[in-house]
Amino acid sequence: MEAITLTPAAEVINNLFFALDYQILAIYHALALACPWITPIMVGISYTAKSGIPLIIASIVMICFKKTRRTGIYCLAGLTVGAILVNVIVKPLIMRPRPYVFNADIRSWWTFVGSHTESDGSFPSGHTNAAADFSVAFCYANGKKYVPWAILYIVLMGISRNWLQVHYPSDVLFGMIFGIGAGFIAGALVSFCYRKFEERKSIKNANPEK
């Protein structure tokens, strides 16, 4: 493969994580060889957060119904904060090459599972970030009872991106970190706005115009 020129930030990340990333991706490849029937499942999981679009659609649908409107607003806010943080700021700043571009072995593993090329940088994982944005915001709106399901979805999304060899494990890890952070930030902002709205509503009801 041709030599890849790394940005200073991408070079630091590769120096820190590549050796371990490679070993973990090798394990995923071994699992894909042993259990090829899992690959279509991983593709399906991955598609639920493709460009964040399915999750954006889910949020908008929830907003359309009074019973789920509050949840939809939280989720859409989480996705928005996460997209700005990861897709607008961090990814263009780091510009870490995809693993299948950087390493010949990983490229052969990527070819084996039939993955497609991705158009943006590898660090952090946008799919995992979106899954975490959405899930944390959903839990923020609905309480702790959904936390186990949120954790399961976030973890499965990260696994799917590694299984398909389109992200390093470190990309996924930081996608989770950024996504969880964005979800909490969005949840706090939306909760603040709701409180202010309720306060104004209470004041208005207590002092109706005569």
Feature annotation, model-predicted:
Residues 61, 81, 85-90, 94, ...:
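Alpha-helical membrane-inserting segments
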Residues 44, 74-81, 173-176:
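Loop-to-helix transition at the N-terminal end of transmembrane alpha-helices
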Residues 1-55, 87-117, 208:
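N-terminal transmembrane-helix/juxtamembrane module of multi-pass inner/ER membrane proteins
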Residues 35-37, 67-72, 142-149:
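Membrane-helix interface segments
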